[in-house]
Amino acid sequence: MKKNISRNPLWPDWYHGKKIDEVQFGRAFLEQWPLKCINGTLYTLDGPVEDESEIKQRILENIEEYVTSGLSKKVTNILETIKLLAFSDPFPIEQDCVHLQNGVYHLPDGSFQESRLFCQNRLPVKYDPKAPSPERWLTFLHELLDDADIPTLQEYLGYCLIPSTKGQKMMLIVGKGGEGKSRIGLVLKRLMGDAASNGSVQKVENNRFARADLERRLLMIDDDMDMNALPKTNYIKTIVTAEAKLDLERKGVQSYQRDIYARFLCFGNGALTSLYDHSDGFFRRQLILTTKDKPADRTDDPFLVEKMCAELEGILLWCLEGLHRLVQNDFRFTVSERAAANVDTIKRSSNNVIDFMESEGYFRFKADYSISSKEFYDIYKLWCEDNACHSVSAIRFSAELRQNDRRYNLETTNNIYLPGGRRVRGFVGIEPLVHPCP
């Protein structure tokens, strides 16, 4: 015969003398600490919970005097129950507002709402329209970049505050080393909190699990970009211009579809290049800013980041100003002549076929002339030898010409005839001026 346990009036409602009612505990817990659970991730009013240990600790503090064994397992079970009770549909992707520590900034009219709502990302900085201008930050940027490139950076950092890929760009800041360019990334981590993560562009492209780390992020910072050329670029290009859900993988978990809106901000001593992709699509996705040389007599300030982070509220206003300008310009970035030339220079350095096609003395464009693919490739190899360049393969050389035939007014043909009646491939519109020895 079961012995009835008299209820102690001091016991919480979810404890019945021998066991804890997990559902009742979960409801009481959510009343005290509101949470939502989306796709297995818990959210507080501050945004996604990156580490559940704090929540587990709160559960432990509530139940430890009522559990005599299996405490760890009980805490885990209750946490899973809370996730079920806190289930919520995904938050809408809000591209017209920025959730901040003290409220919501509305982009269309620049108004501010002093209320904290559940959201996908909340930046750990307060909105203060009267915050002073971030003079130390601005001085640092003027010492680091050409003045014409600062508006581009301002617009891009503002762009990273909202979950949008409409700008369809990634940013690279390139220097010789020691200029302090990576300080920008450290300040952004303080400005954006967990909405920004550190990572590697190479890893995102080459490691199938790394792309899942971009979920829920506004920005990924690569503060020391690997200079090795990418063997492929399809994932990077897709993420930069993402307009639909992407397939993500985590170890031991079935792949799933999610919206990814993370932007890339990369710092390095050289630009991002590809072994095989030399298309306009790869290069037009890049904004490349080059730094000024480090003054020989400059003494580095070890407290520079702390000084700039003291201006976070002013830096936020500066970024919002850039975001407004970008939106008003239909997400077309301000690009200086220098920045545009940077992209062209990198494109040429990774594809010397462009320089060859603009060379003199080896061939000329003439509508009523034609040349076989092999003869034209031999002329190109001669140009490479004369200019101490590595030649690309014959297949890639012909492919580059076919992709740019309109640019050079060429016509691809299969009707080039050699002595003996042999018919080969070639191009109409080229007159050879040199004839390399076979």
Label each PLM-derived region with a short phrase:
Residues 1-3, 38-66:
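Modules that initiate DNA replication and primer synthesis
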Residues 1-38, 64-438:
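Feature primarily recognizes SF3-like P-loop helicase cores of small DNA viruses
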